[in-house]
Regions:
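Expand to "…catalyze enediolate/carbanion chemistry for C-C bond making/breaking, isomerization
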Residues: 1-173
Length: 173
């Protein structure tokens, strides 16, 4: 489930209301993860209040976007229910450099590479429309492998981000 990029700012409150209703009816045996808004955003407190308002807790994990360092993870962990599993998105140059430290947190169960925000953060050429996809994909291999290595060094799962060339059936497969 997502409260971040897939929900416009104007629709955040309505999305939370819908999720509160939906999650209150969900069977506890289901594995459910929720991506929240960045901690520094105006929307994070309401996301935290939503999550902390459940008893029993229907969420298995919380997906944390735009994590830049271990302190970001610690801040989230302190605000969420005790022991909540955290899935961290590495979406910035600083997050990439700090990925091994981020992965060391005991509540972190996975690292995911977020290529779009990462490219913007790193000033990569793919943030310019028209950059050929093979050039972009090649440029993303090194940071992606750093996320994979950081995750696996700490016994965590690593995920790649979305594949943007959805009309490329061969590449998408």
């Amino acid at each position: 489930l997502d409260l971040e990029d897939s929900v416009t700012p104007a629709d955040k409150a309505a999305a939370r209301t819908y999720l509160k209703d939906f999650l209150s009816k969900v069977e506890s045996k289901k594995r459910i993860s929720l991506r929240v808004n960045e901690l520094s955003s105006a929307f994070a407190k309401a996301d935290i209040d939503l999550i902390c308002g459940f008893n029993p807790q229907p969420l298995s994990s919380v997906i944390l976007p735009k994590i830049h360092n271990l302190d970001d993870v610690k801040s989230w962990a302190a605000k969420l229910p005790a022991g909540m599993e955290l899935e961290v998105q590495i979406e910035s140059a600083m997050g990439l450099i700090q990925a091994p430290h981020i992965a060391s947190h005991p509540q972190v169960i996975s690292l995911a590479f977020g290529p779009a925000d990462f490219m913007a953060s790193a000033g990569m050429p793919s943030s310019n429309p028209g950059t050929p996809w093979p050039e972009v994909a090649n440029a993303l291999q090194w940071p992606l492998m750093q996320v994979v290595i950081a995750a696996h060094a700490h016994g965590k799962t690593a995920y790649d981000g979305p594949y943007f060339q959805i009309s490329d059936d061969l590449g998408l497969s």
